[in-house]
Amino acid sequence: MIRRPPRSTPLYSSAASDVYKRQSMIAPNSNNPGRVLAIAVFLAGLIQLTFLMPFLKSFNRFPTPRWGWNDQGVKRIIKLMIPSMIGSSASQFNLLFNTLIASFLSAGSISWIYYSDRLLEFPVGVFGVALSTVVLPTLSRESANQDISTFKSTLDWGIKIALIISVPSAVGLFILSGPLIATIFLGGNFTNYDLDMTQYSLMAYSFGLIGLCLVLVLSPAFYSREDAKTPLRFGLIAMSCNAVCSLLFVLSLVWLGVNYPHIGLALAFSIASIINASLLARELINQNLVLLDKSFLYLISRVIIATLAMSAFLLGFNQENSIWISSGITERIFSLLFLIGVSVIIYFGVLFLLGFRFKEIRIKSKIKKYNIKNLILYICF
């Protein structure tokens, strides 16, 4: 009898490797902390891989390398993999291009872009990737079974969850950009000026969060049907838009004498992400796989109203950067947690007052219950 390993095994291995990385970052008396961190990242990945091997072997799934290049299945996977890699990496290519452009700007521009991108990628990694991980296998199974009705239901569920989470998160990231950066990064070589410059780019990045999360949900709708060319085509369009907008915005801001032209790079990234998501959504609508019916539009309207209520609270109670700078680290942490906690309560409270119930996003497909549990586990870890 094959024994199934715990479904949370990858999460525990990831947590174990993350602990190792964190411990290495605070290694005492290190003359070269950069080298220590680089080695720690490598060892953390090795630990994670080693942790998974016994569980793979326990249910006869331990990989044995065999180069079956002539196998039809391998050829099909390679044919799908190459365009999928490029299409799904559009945002990473955009970030790499923006980093290249930032290298020609004032000193510190690369760091400002990097720090703000890290804060943007956190909710994407926590919510967007977790949602994509849960949705993809379900869509693949339903596509293989030619069950279009449940395929639509799963996709609709993923889109609604992505919007319910990403819209308020983007607005919160915009309003709380200063407090977040001050709490996490301020101190040492990271000066008040760096705080202001990083805040500008994070504010421009924030609305790209919606596009990034939607891309992570919409792309599996194509990959699950073995259509890798459509996301590739739209990804290339998004990369082209990012390149053109980045150069246009940066050159315009430099010509105008603005002291923070790197904000143009972040703004171009957000625009490209939204364009990519919009193209994917339009294609799915044309294929009658996504329906913008009254219930969907009604849900979006309530999300917007609840987000506005949350924004009013944050704008009213958030303080200027100078106050955050003068506060101690403990006070910053508790103040930030208070603002985030209350804003979450206000957001979902207003949603429920407007008649929202979780049954509206109850999945109607044959998705297994453990996939929902895995979504929660991925988010928690």
Predicted regions and their residues:
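Single conserved hydrophobic/aromatic residue that forms the stacking wall/gate
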Residues: 1-23
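Interfacial segments at transmembrane-helix termini and the short loops linking adjacent helices
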Residues: 174-208, 259, 325-330
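Interfacial transmembrane-helix starts/ends
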Residues: 78, 114, 135, 143, ...
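Membrane-proximal transmembrane or re-entrant/amphipathic helices at the cytosolic face
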Residues: 291-292, 316-381
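Interfacial/gating helices of multi-pass transporter permease domains
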Residues: 34, 80, 102-122, 191-199, ...
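Helix-loop junctions and terminal segments of transmembrane helices
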Residues: 129-147, 218-219
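Interhelical loop/hinge segments that connect adjacent transmembrane helices in multipass membrane
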Residues: 34-38, 53-91, 285-303, 361-363
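Membrane-interface junctions at transmembrane-helix termini in multi-pass inner-membrane proteins
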Residues: 4, 17, 207-237, 247-248
